[in-house]
Amino acid sequence: MAVEDDVSLIRTTTLVAPTRPTITVPHRPPAIETAAYFFGGGDGLSLSPGPLSFVSSLFVDNFPDVLTPDNQRTTSFTHLLTSPMFFPPQSSAHTGFIQPRQQSQPQPQRPDTFPHHMPPSTSVAVHGRQSLDVSQVDQRARNHYNNPGNNNNNRSYNVVNVDKPADDGYNWRKYGQKPIKGCEYPRSYYKCTHVNCPVKKKVERSSDGQITQIIYKGQHDHERPQNRRGGGGRDSTEVGGAGQMMESSDDSGYRKDHDDDDDDDEDDEDLPASKIRRIDGVSTTHRTVTEPKIIVQTKSEVDLLDDGYRWRKYGQKVVKGNPHPRSYYKCTTPNCTVRKHVERASTDAKAVITTYEGKHNHDVPAARNGTAAATAAAVGPSDHHRMRSMSGNNMQQHMSFGNNNNTGQSPVLLRLKEEKITI
């Protein structure tokens, strides 16, 4: 009997299944009602004050009492999020890309819109400091722009025209220039503007633009002009940092004569030191030096005549219209500036023309052999002293040159002319 009761109890327990719990899903409201449910509008037409309102559903509205701007107590987290502390009043929106300047400046807040955690006096002080800083920056920028001393566009610079030769009293016209290796400034070529005046000069400058050398070629056949052409005409005269400078600005006559430039360059070594004007400082002095130029023409089979002095050949060049080149020599005695060039006549191949320039500052060196001694004795110190004492233009003098037995070296003509060079 007891066993049957146990079996029936087990059978009853096995057959009865437990009841499952059920979940009831509430009715889903429309979209407008859902927005009203979340944002608390009630009528479904209010907008969200911000994305932080969604967070309010995650917290329990049991915060301590908080004072709202209208001095009302609230314990709602939503009220805390929508308070002016998180959402200060926004300025009206402006259309367009550029806004007026006064609208971009910060505006002080009204006392009723101050966050409850900041006193109104503090907020006014902050906005006032910002406005003061902006106005100070604007005023400094305006003063810097209007002040000529700070404006880079109004800076004055001392401009020195480096293409003007030093004034020597004559009027010059530039007719060409040539670049120089290792120098930024080219060599300039000038000629006297006086009618039929053959004088030319070359001006060289250093790397800093200062005039270092002026070489004159020829002799002026006129006096210095009295009425100098001023800046009112086409010729300009200006006073610069390196002294008074003058140059003709006649661009129509600016030309490049390659033949003249080549001749001038190759004649540099042929010029005596007295013809070269070197400028070491700002101020220069002008003095006239009388430099004799002796031309000897003789019949000879050799080009270099034995006149008792020792010479060293330093170059030669081709002469136009002459098949024979011109050779250049300089005296080998130290500190002696005498030079000569030797060439044959274009019409007579046996005629040797020797041109001496300068004065020897020493005696005739000792003769190396008898022939040289006889030649030195014939042309010796007495003749050279006589040459140095002669003056005047286009003077001709016959002299005994060399050994009388050697008829091949008897000179036929000696021309001595005086040159006045301003240095």
UniProtKB/Swiss-Prot annotation:
SMART domains in the cross-refs: WRKY (SM00774)
Compartments, as annotated in UniProt: Nucleus
Domain of life: Eukaryota
InterPro entries reported in the protein's UniProt record: WRKY_dom, WRKY_dom_sf, WRKY_plant
Any GO BP annotation: regulation of defense response
One Pfam family it belongs to: WRKY
DNA-binding region: 161-225, 300-365
UniProt source species: Arabidopsis thaliana (Mouse-ear cress)
Ranges annotated as biased composition (Low complexity): 99-111, 144-162
MF terms (GO), sorted A to Z: DNA-binding transcription factor activity; sequence-specific DNA binding
Protein name: Probable WRKY transcription factor 58
Primary role: Transcription factor. Interacts specifically with the W box (5'-(T)TGAC[CT]-3'), a frequently occurring elicitor-responsive cis-acting element.
Alphabetically ordered keywords of this record: DNA-binding, Nucleus, Repeat, Transcription, Transcription regulation
Start and end residues of each stretch annotated as Disordered: 91-128, 142-171, 215-284
Acidic residues composition bias: residue spans: 259-271
GO CC annotation, single: nucleus
